[in-house]
Amino acid sequence: MTYSRNIFIPLTRACRNRCGYCTFRSDTPEPPLLEPEDVMGEVRRALSLGCTEALFTFGEDAHEFPGVRDKLESLGFGDMTDYTYHLCELTLDAGLLPHTNMGVIGYRELRMLKEVNASMGLMLESASPRLMETEAHRESPGKNPRLRIKMIEDAGRLRIPFTTGLLIGIGETIEERAESLLELRRIQDRYGHIQEIIIQNFRSKPGIPMENQREPSLLEMVKMVAAAKIMFPDVSIQVPPNLNRETGEIFLLAGADDWGGVSPISRDYVNPEAPWPEIDELKRITESAGFALEERLPVYRKFISREFLSPRVMERIEELYPRFIETL
């Protein structure tokens, strides 16, 4: 059972999507954008606590918001991709390995960011276009599954180690859940770059449009984890531990083999009501189910090679984290 010791750095809460289950986005984020000195202060703090991963997550097409655009221009950047590249570059030089999830972006942006990222990510959430007509995604053009599937495929063409996953309980049917797994299996069979699939349960929060939506049951989640593991024996299956503190052991027995990024320094800004468990607590939960807990990097060991990583990232891993490299 693995985990990555990380810091979560939300560069901005501005986002073009208005998902019915989200508390992260803001029309007027304050500050509109984290500045480099703030980011690097967090990076240095993370390094002092033994973190290896910097998770850069922020709203999709954030540079379309006037406040963000003005701040980018004042810093000398044209858009969020250019700015993220710069921050990833600084972070990599400092000794943390970047993992970026900035919503749907194109092939050119992916190719650019691969140079300074150990891995990247985008949740598929669901392959069902029907959800675009529901409260979950009615006001979220970036949640169109066609766009998200294309980005995951583009990452495969570029040989980027990739994390994706499904969001369970946002109005999808059992059949649509199965179709979503089959879509990811099709992509993986063609490109082989998916390192991890997250099976994440919807959690109701006060004040969101979907506040009264029923959360998925434990049995539903167990079935999804088991189905994912059967369909993806070559991919790690993650269940977020902070969203399932009381039931974590059950998911291990169902086939989950990764806890994802766990931070000793930052909260989960997407689910602020659910703090990360301490590493010692994760160890206890894991061992109580009969498994050992092992730390990993944001790129899984089998993807640590020049086939999947840029020379720049590979050299940093060889220099700083040789113990994580697969030895033959």
Curated annotation (Swiss-Prot):
GO terms for molecular function: 4 iron, 4 sulfur cluster binding; 7,8-didemethyl-8-hydroxy-5-deazariboflavin synthase activity; iron ion binding; transferase activity, transferring alkyl or aryl (other than methyl) groups. Its EC number is 4.3.1.32. The keyword Iron-sulfur applies. The gene is cofG. The keyword S-adenosyl-L-methionine applies. One of its GO terms (biological process) is water-soluble vitamin biosynthetic process. This is 7,8-didemethyl-8-hydroxy-5-deazariboflavin synthase. Keywords: 4Fe-4S, Iron, Iron-sulfur, Lyase, Metal-binding, S-adenosyl-L-methionine. Consists of two subunits, CofG and CofH. It is an enzyme of class 4 (lyase). Catalyzes the radical-mediated synthesis of 7,8-didemethyl-8-hydroxy-5-deazariboflavin from 5-amino-5-(4-hydroxybenzyl)-6-(D-ribitylimino)-5,6-dihydrouracil. InterPro entries: Aldolase_TIM (IPR013785), BATS_dom (IPR010722), CofG_family (IPR019939), Elp3/MiaA/NifB-like_rSAM (IPR006638), F420 (IPR034405), rSAM (IPR007197). Residues 1-242 form the Radical SAM core domain. PANTHER family: 7,8-DIDEMETHYL-8-HYDROXY-5-DEAZARIBOFLAVIN SYNTHASE, FO SYNTHASE (COFH). CDD domains: Radical_SAM. Pathway: Cofactor biosynthesis; coenzyme F0 biosynthesis. Binds 1 [4Fe-4S] cluster. The cluster is coordinated with 3 cysteines and an exchangeable S-adenosyl-L-methionine. Its cofactor is [4Fe-4S] cluster. SMART domains: BATS, Elp3. Belongs to the radical SAM superfamily. CofG family.
